[in-house]
Amino acid sequence: MEDFVRQCFNPMIVELAEKAMKEYGEDLKIETNKFAAICTHLEVCFMYSDFHFINEQGESIIVELDDPNALLKHRFEIIEGRDRTMAWTVVNSICNTTGAEKPKFLPDLYDYKENRFIEIGVTRREVHIYYLEKANKIKSEKTHIHIFSFTGEEMATKADYTLDEESRARIKTRLFTIRQEMASRGLWDSFRQSERGEETIEERFEITGTMRRLADQSLPPNFSCLENFRAYVDGFEPNGYIEGKLSQMSKEVNARIEPFLKTTPRPIRLPDGPPCSQRSKFLLMDALKLSIEDPSHEGEGIPLYDAIKCMRTFFGWKEPYVVKPHEKGINPNYLLSWKQVLAELQDIENEGKIPRTKNMKKTSQLKWALGENMAPEKVDFDDCKDISDLKQYDSDEPKLRSLSSWIQNEFNKACELTDSIWIELDEIGEDVAPIEHIASMRRNYFTAEVSHCRATEYIMKGVYINTALLNASCAAMDDFQLIPMISKCRTKEGRRKTNLYGFIIKGRSHLRNDTDVVNFVSMEFSLTDPRLEPHKWEKYCVLEIGDMLLRSAIGQVSRPMFLYVRTNGTSKIKMKWGMEMRRCLLQSLQQIESMIEAESSVKEKDMTKEFFENKSETWPIGESPKGVEEGSIGKVCRTLLAKSVFNSLYASPQLEGFSAESRKLLLVVQALRDNLEPGTFDLGGLYEAIEECLINDPWVLLNASWFNSFLTHALR
């Protein structure tokens, strides 16, 4: 523990803690847990005070380090960490100048803004128990108490937390990091169990007379005398407290807190049934691109011009035919729809002048595919409320589906590197503050790791398709507009490249509400034979439309080219979020940043450079049946990004529910791993809530399978 403390804390804090222990005649070689506790408390007091100043107008402001304004008056006077004589001198001086009441015990800080002393507490136990002990010891309404715990909880007098949320979050993050570092070295258990309650003068002396009456009068409500209150605090059981509170709520509520042990949790039950099918709005790993390098044609950048130019690069077109029919659809209509697209593109070329947009003829096959005139007629409720058997039409329960291997393959593919660059480094002006320099350095390192990633391609593809579809839905509400599915990238050599994945035909789109649906037919190129995994393509009709010559080790080989066609739909709100998919980059960057922050706070310097440039170090990526998978920092970046992208591509109520409910179980398991002796009630109900979200969604089923792998290895 002593070695850990010297590594983990600033040398100045360690020195102050050594002095304090010497002053109280304690041996830090023996009382190592106390040594760690004093250092932690000192650091929290310093962090509490950091960056907080009072300006000339007497207002509290936050100023980062290295700021020329740091000559402003400090908002907090730090009393903790001074020797006793000096500390009391400071307290007396404050009382004389501010008129504050002199405290009986040495407080930790004085707040010049609120004009009050502050007692800071850091506890390994329940915050409210420690708060009561502190309040009982101080017995002064003038001293403000603020308690932090290692689990992120806090409690303060009258729920007045003094600091802004961000400053308190820094303290909580640091405490959580210390706890994790201790746990990883096997020190946390002993440290947690070594905490003793606040020693008070009352425990050493018999209290009589006036003092006794005052003690009895200053108890919390519902306690008649000091003995009762002492007995309550000594015998306080948080789990029993929760049970009692629940039983007060209702006679029907009867919760018994059961201990949560390694043998308690069972795996999550995944549903049986036929394998799940692909439900993303566009093809992922199976997509094929027709591309042009260094585009410089007339009208370059206009989607229809780009699409026709890309189509001209392929010469292997042939008479299309259905190779994998859609079980419930009219497959000849899908075939006719593709032929219509080819014919209308040919008409454009024959005319010589390419229009900016193309509206398809409203043929019977497109009307069928886009559900034209299929929606039931809407009738005003007032006109039919007197009908006796009026009811909402029955909808079938979704059929249960089982997990299939294709979704894991999709995820693995999303984490891989491609041979193209999908995002540019943002051009940002020079940094003016150290924190900006660190932030842009992190962003640049992260961008370098993910710019070639396939998940980044999916982001740019999703942004383009959703933007184009939303624009067309608003600009051409009654038209069946042809929308090319395009993306732009750069080759490794830096040459620009335009890619065509296929086409979308949009249906009627009078979208008044956010959730109103626009139907569309997607037609996407692929080299994947659908007959290899027919269950994956349940919702598609697949045509063979040509033969493509590919370079291979044995020379050129010819491969059949397929077109994956399906009817689909989306809404304004879904398209709006699809246009925002770049946020996935930000989310995964923030996750990486929190890893860097944890590392930096232990080493007490910014570890960004070492983090990304130490290629020999491996990091945990996730769980698999084999155990904890590890990889380079680049692999971690790409895996986190792919998870974020798949959460966007496969967003659904099932995913929302599973994420929220499984997180509760995850927290309990984490608490067990940290030896926090968690207790639960109605664990069966929690499993039920998790499992009712496992219906047919491939991404949710995969996450549930990963969760089971985590359970297996976490509880060994």
UniProtKB/Swiss-Prot annotation:
Key word Transmembrane present in the record? no
**What is its EC class?**
hydrolase
Q: Which GO terms describe its cellular component?
A: host cell cytoplasm; host cell nucleus
GO MF term list: endonuclease activity; metal ion binding; RNA binding
Q: Which Gene Ontology BP annotations are present?
A: cap snatching; DNA-templated transcription; symbiont-mediated suppression of host gene expression; symbiont-mediated suppression of host mRNA transcription via inhibition of RNA polymerase II activity; viral RNA genome replication; viral translational frameshifting
Which positions bind Mn(2+) 2? E80, D108
- Where does this protein chiefly localize? host cell
Positions occupied by motif Nuclear localization signal 1 (NLS1): 124-139
Q: Which cofactor does it need?
A: Mn(2+)
Cite the record's note on assembly.
Answer: Influenza RNA polymerase is composed of three subunits: PB1, PB2 and PA. Interacts (via C-terminus) with PB1 (via N-terminus).
The record's function comment reads:
Plays an essential role in viral RNA transcription and replication by forming the heterotrimeric polymerase complex together with PB1 and PB2 subunits. The complex transcribes viral mRNAs by using a unique mechanism called cap-snatching. It consists in the hijacking and cleavage of host capped pre-mRNAs. These short capped RNAs are then used as primers for viral mRNAs. The PB2 subunit is responsible for the binding of the 5' cap of cellular pre-mRNAs which are subsequently cleaved after 10-13 nucleotides by the PA subunit that carries the endonuclease activity.
Listed name of the protein: Polymerase acidic protein
Species assigned in the record: Influenza A virus (strain A/Brazil/11/1978 H1N1)
